[in-house]
Curated annotation (Swiss-Prot):
Gene this chain is encoded by: proB
Name the UniProt record assigns to this protein: Glutamate 5-kinase
Record function comment: Catalyzes the transfer of a phosphate group to glutamate to form L-glutamate 5-phosphate.
PANTHER family: GLUTAMATE 5-KINASE (PTHR43654), ISOPENTENYL PHOSPHATE KINASE (PTHR43654:SF1)
Binding site for substrate: S58, D145, N157
Gene3D superfamilies xrefs: Acetylglutamate kinase-like, PUA domain
Sample GO molecular function, one term: ATP binding
Length: 368
């Protein structure tokens, strides 16, 4: 009997496909439009079978290296951004040409972490991608490297693809790269590295040693593991597979490592609070408040707060930390920082009527 988690990938009606930089370049780091076209062929086959697909494509910086006459991937931020601005044109043109062979139109969607973190931009991005799919266009998503900073140096779109998967309500996420799947150690360095075909939860990753990014991109195994677990925790199954076997990955999911999704999909709002929103500050809780919030999923009352940090306002997302400063939850706060600083440690009966709401309502809390 086959794996039910691979079956979930096979039968998904909506899929986000993340294509890493190394999947689009030669071993020497040159952008290869031929490789991209081959991936488009595999993706087209899945779409022809009736699946909606959104592509998260890396490769803009790599695609800009040759046109700018650079000998290697730049290291300084300004040159990376210049290469990205040139390469993004070549990248999208290549995707456009590849899908034009099948009569399909592509749409470019450039995002930053800030766009995902801010609720209004988050919703607008969701609407744009949903509308592209409704119009039978292929959404090509990439990080907006020309204005991003840390985003260029970390992740190589792995985390972005997990966020987009939940953003569009995808049934599955497929990460295509230059690796066969997940091993308990780097197989290029350790001959006895053990292949892990299926991950049912974080406990399966105990003892796994994950490497960092390649010289062509920035997303190493650690980034892919983290992003796969993020998506799986939100209810989206993930397949980590080699781009060379994209056809098999997208047809029968018979290759790579599959990450099982949690049984209950996280709501869009709770996902945004937990993973996407930027934290505007933090609240330190006493032990009783931690038990109430984490153990019993109750609202946070001002009486359980011992410290307030940051300049936030009602409606912002804040971190909730225990007495040892470890984050235990995140939530949407109901009051400004200045108000909470005056309210903390006081029982509800001591507060004026307009200040008797919970500091963070249980419906706006997500344990971490």
């Amino acid at each position: 009997m086959g794996s039910p988690h691979r079956e979930a990938i096979r039968t998904a009606r909506s899929v986000v496909v993340k294509v890493g930089t190394t999947a689009l370049t030669t071993p020497s780091g040159v952008f290869d439009a031929g490789r991209l076209a081959e991936l488009a062929d595999a993706i087209e086959s899945r779409m022809k079978a009736g699946t909606d697909v959104v592509i998260v494509s890396s490769g803009a910086i790599a695609a800009g290296i040759e046109p700018l006459g650079l000998s290697r991937r730049p290291k300084d931020l300004a040159t990376k951004q210049a290469a990205a601005s040139v390469g993004q044109v070549a990248l999208v043109n290549s995707w456009s040409a590849a899908f034009a062979r099948y009569g399909r139109t592509v749409g470019q969607v450039l995002l930053t972490a800030h766009d995902i973190a801010m609720r209004v931009q988050h919703t607008n991005a969701q609407r744009t991608l949903d509308r592209l799919r409704a119009l039978h266009a292929v959404g090509i998503v990439n990080e907006n490297d020309t204005v991003a900073t840390n985003e260029i140096r970390f992740g190589d779109n792995d985390r972005l693809s997990a966020l987009v998967a939940h953003l569009v309500g995808a049934d599955a996420l497929v990460l295509l790269s230059d690796i066969d799947g997940l091993y308990d150690a780097d197989p290029r360095k350790f001959q006895n590295a053990r292949f892990i075909p299926e991950v049912s939860g974080p406990a399966d990753l105990d003892g796994v040693v994950a490497g960092q990014g390649s010289h062509l991109g920035t997303g190493g195994m650690a980034s892919k593991m983290s992003s796969a677990l993020l998506a799986a925790d939100a209810g989206v199954p993930v397949l980590l597979a080699p781009a060379a076997d994209a056809a098999a990955a997208l047809t029968d999911a018979s290759v790579g490592t599959v990450f099982a999704a949690r049984s209950e999909r996280m709501s869009a709002r709770r996902f945004w609070v937990r993973y996407a929103a930027e934290s505007a500050g933090s609240l330190t809780l006493d032990e009783g408040a931690v038990r109430a919030v984490v153990g019993h999923r109750r609202s946070l009352l001002p009486a359980g707060i011992t410290a307030v940090a940051g300049k936030f306002f009602g409606g912002d997302v804040v971190d909730l930390c225990g007495p040892d400063a470890t984050m235990v939850a995140r939530g949407v706060v109901a009051y400004d920082a200045t108000e909470l600083a005056a309210m903390m440690g006081r029982s509800t009966s001591e507060l004026p009527g307009e200040l008797r709401r919970p500091a963070v309502h249980a419906d706006d809390l997500v344990a971490v």
